Amino acid sequence: MTADPATRICPLRPQDHAAWLPLWRGYQSFYEVDIPSEVSASTWARLLDPAEPVAGALAWNGPAAVGLVHHIRHRSCWTTGDYCYLQDLFVSPAVRGSGIGRKLIEHVYAEAAREGCARVYWLTHETNATAMRLYDRVADRSGFVQYRKNLLPGVFRPAKEA
């Protein structure tokens, strides 16, 4: 299935909050996490602040928002150009497989190139086989394994533990 040619990818605007929030919650539900509302409010404010290195976009099919993407530009010790971390990507279940995920990724590629970034990269859960089929077509697997240590207990918690 291919994306509807009328699907538009548009940078987030203040008036998009009501369309963004259900997608943001759907993304959290997909990964079985419960992000506190104050963190979501801070995230929204950062996404709209041009002084912040984070940005986002929504995919629109007509009047309906059907996908979101957030990305963060940051310095790298390996290049003089910045890197772009594609942190969040979510497409409504009803339109998955239609090419919207690819369009959102391509939007990030274009934004990162415009900003002079040397690389776009992202993570996904090892069980997200459907998404990985797309990712294998639009990027290269790095072979790296992520390790992490949460330093602020309770700020980011699985929904099962909330």
Where are these regions (language model features)?
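A short beta-loop-alpha structural element at the N-terminal edge
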Residues: R8-P22
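Conserved GNAT-fold acetyl-CoA-binding loop/helix
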Residues: L21-R46
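A short helix-loop-beta-strand connector motif used in the catalytic cores of GNAT acetyltransferases and
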Residues: R46-L58, Y85, R141-G143
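Conserved beta-strand in the GNAT
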Residues: G56-L58, A64-R73
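A conserved beta-turn-beta hairpin within the catalytic core of GNAT-like acetyltransferases
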Residues: A64, H74-L86, R96, G143
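Conserved acetyl-CoA-binding loop-helix of GNAT-fold acetyltransferases
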Residues: V91, G97-A110
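Conserved active-site alpha-helix within GNAT-family acetyltransferase domains
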Residues: R102, E126-V145
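Conserved GNAT acetyl-CoA-binding A-motif
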Residues: A113-L123
